[in-house]
A protein has these predicted regions:
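Active-site pre-lysine segment of PLP-dependent enzymes
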Residues: 1-18, 22-53
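PLP-dependent enzyme catalytic core of the Aspartate aminotransferase-like
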Residues: 3, 153-154, 159, 163-195
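Residue-level detector of anion-binding/catalytic polar loops
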Residues: 17, 125, 157
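PLP-dependent aminotransferase class I/II
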Residues: 43-127
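Short acidic/glycine-enriched loop/turn segments that link adjacent beta-strands
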Residues: 58, 130, 165-168
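Short beta-strand-to-loop capping motifs
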Residues: 66, 136-140, 174-176
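Conserved PLP-binding catalytic core of the aspartate aminotransferase-like
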Residues: 109, 121-154, 170
Length: 195
Protein backbone atom coordinates (compact mmCIF):
# COMPACT_ATOMS: atom_id res chain seq x y z
CA UNK A 1 0.00 0.00 0.00
CA UNK A 2 1.02 3.61 -0.37
CA UNK A 3 1.06 3.94 3.42
CA UNK A 4 3.57 1.08 3.67
CA UNK A 5 5.78 2.68 1.02
CA UNK A 6 5.64 5.99 2.91
CA UNK A 7 6.67 4.19 6.12
CA UNK A 8 9.54 2.51 4.28
CA UNK A 9 10.71 5.87 2.93
CA UNK A 10 10.58 7.42 6.41
CA UNK A 11 12.67 4.62 7.95
CA UNK A 12 15.44 4.71 5.34
CA UNK A 13 18.68 6.52 6.13
CA UNK A 14 18.94 9.78 4.18
CA UNK A 15 21.89 8.43 2.18
CA UNK A 16 19.88 5.34 1.08
CA UNK A 17 17.85 5.86 -2.08
CA UNK A 18 14.39 4.29 -2.36
CA UNK A 19 13.55 3.58 -6.01
CA UNK A 20 9.86 3.10 -6.80
CA UNK A 21 9.29 1.05 -9.94
CA UNK A 22 6.13 2.47 -11.51
CA UNK A 23 6.14 0.19 -14.56
CA UNK A 24 2.49 -0.75 -14.09
CA UNK A 25 1.24 2.57 -12.69
CA UNK A 26 -0.86 3.37 -15.77
CA UNK A 27 -2.97 0.25 -15.20
CA UNK A 28 -4.22 1.48 -11.84
CA UNK A 29 -6.96 3.98 -11.21
CA UNK A 30 -5.97 7.07 -9.23
CA UNK A 31 -2.43 5.78 -8.67
CA UNK A 32 0.41 8.21 -9.25
CA UNK A 33 3.25 5.69 -8.96
CA UNK A 34 4.79 7.59 -6.07
CA UNK A 35 4.97 11.11 -7.51
CA UNK A 36 3.59 12.73 -4.34
CA UNK A 37 6.07 10.84 -2.17
CA UNK A 38 8.98 11.87 -4.41
CA UNK A 39 7.93 15.51 -4.10
CA UNK A 40 8.29 15.36 -0.32
CA UNK A 41 11.31 13.09 0.21
CA UNK A 42 14.91 13.79 -0.72
CA UNK A 43 15.85 10.10 -0.99
CA UNK A 44 13.03 8.73 -3.17
CA UNK A 45 12.95 8.43 -6.96
CA UNK A 46 10.24 6.99 -9.18
CA UNK A 47 10.84 5.30 -12.53
CA UNK A 48 8.39 4.60 -15.34
CA UNK A 49 8.62 2.71 -18.60
CA UNK A 50 7.07 2.76 -22.04
CA UNK A 51 7.38 -1.04 -22.14
CA UNK A 52 4.05 -1.96 -20.56
CA UNK A 53 0.85 -0.11 -21.44
CA UNK A 54 2.53 1.79 -24.27
CA UNK A 55 3.77 -1.49 -25.77
CA UNK A 56 7.25 -0.19 -26.58
CA UNK A 57 9.39 -2.80 -24.80
CA UNK A 58 11.85 -3.08 -27.67
CA UNK A 59 12.50 0.65 -27.70
CA UNK A 60 13.95 0.64 -24.16
CA UNK A 61 12.44 4.03 -23.27
CA UNK A 62 11.56 5.18 -19.78
CA UNK A 63 11.76 8.15 -17.50
CA UNK A 64 12.40 8.98 -13.88
CA UNK A 65 11.25 11.63 -11.45
CA UNK A 66 13.22 12.51 -8.38
CA UNK A 67 14.98 15.17 -6.35
CA UNK A 68 17.23 17.46 -8.38
CA UNK A 69 20.51 16.26 -6.79
CA UNK A 70 19.65 12.62 -7.59
CA UNK A 71 18.73 13.42 -11.19
CA UNK A 72 21.93 15.45 -11.60
CA UNK A 73 23.99 12.50 -10.32
CA UNK A 74 22.24 10.16 -12.77
CA UNK A 75 22.90 12.58 -15.62
CA UNK A 76 26.63 12.47 -14.84
CA UNK A 77 26.84 8.66 -15.07
CA UNK A 78 24.49 7.85 -17.94
CA UNK A 79 25.78 7.18 -21.44
CA UNK A 80 25.89 10.15 -23.84
CA UNK A 81 23.46 8.72 -26.42
CA UNK A 82 21.38 6.36 -24.34
CA UNK A 83 18.26 6.80 -26.51
CA UNK A 84 18.01 6.74 -30.27
CA UNK A 85 16.13 9.38 -32.25
CA UNK A 86 13.55 6.80 -33.45
CA UNK A 87 12.96 5.60 -29.87
CA UNK A 88 12.34 9.17 -28.71
CA UNK A 89 10.01 9.85 -31.65
CA UNK A 90 7.97 6.71 -30.99
CA UNK A 91 7.75 7.48 -27.26
CA UNK A 92 6.61 11.04 -27.98
CA UNK A 93 3.93 9.78 -30.37
CA UNK A 94 2.77 7.18 -27.84
CA UNK A 95 2.48 9.58 -24.93
CA UNK A 96 0.47 12.10 -26.95
CA UNK A 97 -2.19 9.51 -27.88
CA UNK A 98 -3.84 9.11 -24.49
CA UNK A 99 -7.18 8.10 -26.05
CA UNK A 100 -5.47 5.00 -27.43
CA UNK A 101 -3.88 4.26 -24.05
CA UNK A 102 -7.28 4.61 -22.38
CA UNK A 103 -8.77 2.10 -24.84
CA UNK A 104 -5.84 -0.28 -24.28
CA UNK A 105 -6.32 -0.08 -20.53
CA UNK A 106 -10.07 -0.71 -20.81
CA UNK A 107 -9.54 -3.67 -23.16
CA UNK A 108 -6.78 -5.10 -20.95
CA UNK A 109 -8.88 -4.79 -17.80
CA UNK A 110 -11.96 -6.38 -19.36
CA UNK A 111 -9.97 -9.24 -20.89
CA UNK A 112 -7.94 -9.75 -17.71
CA UNK A 113 -11.08 -9.96 -15.57
CA UNK A 114 -12.69 -12.42 -18.02
CA UNK A 115 -9.47 -14.47 -18.13
CA UNK A 116 -9.23 -14.71 -14.33
CA UNK A 117 -12.90 -15.68 -14.04
CA UNK A 118 -12.48 -18.33 -16.74
CA UNK A 119 -9.42 -19.85 -15.04
CA UNK A 120 -11.25 -19.90 -11.71
CA UNK A 121 -14.16 -21.71 -13.36
CA UNK A 122 -11.65 -24.43 -14.24
CA UNK A 123 -10.95 -24.77 -10.52
CA UNK A 124 -7.63 -22.95 -10.60
CA UNK A 125 -6.53 -20.26 -8.17
CA UNK A 126 -5.62 -16.84 -9.54
CA UNK A 127 -4.53 -13.79 -7.62
CA UNK A 128 -6.46 -10.60 -8.24
CA UNK A 129 -4.56 -8.41 -10.69
CA UNK A 130 -4.43 -4.73 -11.49
CA UNK A 131 -1.85 -5.05 -14.29
CA UNK A 132 -1.42 -6.79 -17.65
CA UNK A 133 -0.61 -10.20 -16.23
CA UNK A 134 -2.23 -12.94 -14.18
CA UNK A 135 -0.62 -15.10 -11.51
CA UNK A 136 -2.02 -18.61 -11.95
CA UNK A 137 -1.47 -20.94 -8.98
CA UNK A 138 -1.42 -24.72 -9.06
CA UNK A 139 -1.54 -27.29 -6.25
CA UNK A 140 2.22 -27.68 -6.28
CA UNK A 141 5.45 -27.02 -8.19
CA UNK A 142 5.18 -30.25 -10.16
CA UNK A 143 1.78 -29.35 -11.60
CA UNK A 144 3.01 -25.86 -12.54
CA UNK A 145 6.03 -27.37 -14.31
CA UNK A 146 3.86 -29.89 -16.18
CA UNK A 147 1.45 -27.16 -17.28
CA UNK A 148 4.35 -25.00 -18.44
CA UNK A 149 5.72 -27.90 -20.49
CA UNK A 150 2.29 -28.61 -21.97
CA UNK A 151 1.80 -24.95 -22.89
CA UNK A 152 5.22 -24.86 -24.55
CA UNK A 153 4.31 -27.95 -26.58
CA UNK A 154 1.32 -25.96 -27.86
CA UNK A 155 3.44 -22.91 -28.72
CA UNK A 156 2.49 -20.90 -25.63
CA UNK A 157 5.21 -19.31 -23.53
CA UNK A 158 4.48 -18.19 -19.99
CA UNK A 159 6.83 -17.25 -17.17
CA UNK A 160 7.84 -19.51 -14.31
CA UNK A 161 8.18 -17.56 -11.08
CA UNK A 162 10.26 -19.91 -8.94
CA UNK A 163 12.75 -17.08 -8.45
CA UNK A 164 10.05 -15.08 -6.65
CA UNK A 165 9.47 -17.99 -4.27
CA UNK A 166 6.32 -18.97 -6.18
CA UNK A 167 7.26 -22.40 -7.56
CA UNK A 168 3.61 -23.45 -7.82
CA UNK A 169 2.67 -20.48 -10.01
CA UNK A 170 2.86 -19.29 -13.61
CA UNK A 171 2.82 -15.63 -14.67
CA UNK A 172 0.74 -15.15 -17.81
CA UNK A 173 0.60 -11.93 -19.80
CA UNK A 174 -2.90 -10.84 -20.79
CA UNK A 175 -3.22 -10.80 -24.56
CA UNK A 176 -6.23 -9.97 -26.67
CA UNK A 177 -9.53 -11.78 -26.05
CA UNK A 178 -8.98 -14.40 -28.79
CA UNK A 179 -5.53 -15.27 -27.46
CA UNK A 180 -6.83 -15.60 -23.91
CA UNK A 181 -9.75 -17.75 -25.06
CA UNK A 182 -7.30 -20.06 -26.82
CA UNK A 183 -5.11 -20.18 -23.73
CA UNK A 184 -8.03 -21.11 -21.46
CA UNK A 185 -8.81 -23.95 -23.88
CA UNK A 186 -5.22 -25.22 -23.80
CA UNK A 187 -5.10 -25.07 -19.99
CA UNK A 188 -8.41 -26.93 -19.84
CA UNK A 189 -6.91 -29.63 -22.12
CA UNK A 190 -3.97 -29.89 -19.73
CA UNK A 191 -6.24 -30.30 -16.72
CA UNK A 192 -8.30 -33.01 -18.45
CA UNK A 193 -5.08 -34.91 -19.25
CA UNK A 194 -4.13 -34.71 -15.56
CA UNK A 195 -7.29 -36.51 -14.40
Amino acid sequence: TLKQVEELAMKRPKQALLVLDGAYAEYGDNYDGGIQLVKHKSNVIMTRTFSKIYGLGGMRVGWGFGPKPVIEALQRVRGPFNLSVPALAVAEAAITDQDYIKRCKEENNATRDWFIASLRKLGLACDNSFTNFVLLRFKNKSQAELCDQYLQSKGVIVRRVDGYNLPEALRITVGDRNTCERLVGVIEEFLVRQE
